[in-house]
């Protein structure tokens, strides 16, 4: 399973990634994004993931702003 993590706190992102790998070692974290801006820039090219883990409050705004700018059909866990 390919996963994208959108989280502005590096330690939290690393902790989530470690938990996911303990659950299933085959999970691939294919991208980390720490801001609305960086996520929009990359996700606008298409989402090549099976699941998104997204923090609601990012340093430059709410993560909901990402999905108002980019269409994403991938399941999202907030």
Give the residues covered by each predicted segment.
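Active-site residues of response regulator receiver
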Residues: 55
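Non-catalytic signal-transmission and effector/linker regions of two-component phosphorelay proteins
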Residues: 1-2
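A short, hydrophobic beta-strand element within the central beta-sheet of small alpha/beta folds
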Residues: 74-78
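Acidic, metal-coordinating helix/loop segments flanking the phosphotransfer/catalytic sites
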Residues: 17, 32-51
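Conserved acidic carboxylate
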Residues: 7
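Two-component/phosphorelay signaling modules centered on CheY-like receiver
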Residues: 10-31
């Amino acid at each position: 399973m390919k996963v994208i993590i959108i989280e502005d706190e590096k330690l939290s992102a690393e902790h989530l990634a470690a938990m996911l790998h303990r659950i299933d070692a085959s999970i691939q974290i294919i991208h980390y994004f720490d801001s609305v801006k960086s996520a929009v820039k990359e996700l606008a090219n298409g989402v090549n993931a099976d699941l998104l883990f997204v923090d609601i409050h990012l340093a430059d705004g709410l993560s909901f702003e990402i999905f108002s700018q980019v269409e994403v059909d991938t399941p999202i866990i907030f």
